[in-house]
Regions:
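Short, conserved sequence motifs enriched in acidic/basic residues, glycine, and aromatics
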Residues: 58-59, 86
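Helix-turn-helix DNA-binding module
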Residues: 74-91
Length: 117
């Protein structure tokens, strides 16, 4: 159960990683500023973003994929996701839990439960 929570936390951090990378690129482009001390962090975050996107794409095509994509990648709240997908909010939360379980099972079967945080 603890590893499942870690997986969900990794998914939740997608937007944080993406914002960090975007802010670094913005600063470089518009202010001609690039923090060289943050290069390693940027590389780590890009790797984590790729891991998250790969995990979510494992579920494609399915309602679980659509929900995870909208929620974690696009940053849309579950209530709005349920509206977009013509689901009740309760069904969307159930679908979210089901998607988390499928991802956790996939990660365990592939043996890729190494530390990603």
């Amino acid at each position: 159960m603890n590893k499942q929570i870690d997986l969900v936390e990794l998914l939740k951090k997608y937007r944080v990683y993406k914002r960090f990378i975007d802010s670094q690129e913005y600063a470089k482009e518009y202010f001609d500023y690039y923090d060289t001390q943050q290069i390693d962090k940027k590389d780590q975050y890009e790797e984590k973003i790729n891991v998250i996107e790969s995990l979510i794409s494992f579920l494609e095509p399915s309602d679980e994929y659509t929900l995870l994509y909208l929620h974690y990648i696009k940053g849309i709240g579950i209530e709005k996701c349920s509206e977009c997908m013509y689901l009740s909010t309760r069904t969307a939360y159930r679908l979210l839990n089901k998607a988390h379980e499928k991802l956790f099972d996939f990660v365990n079967k592939k043996g890729t439960t190494d530390e990603r945080n």
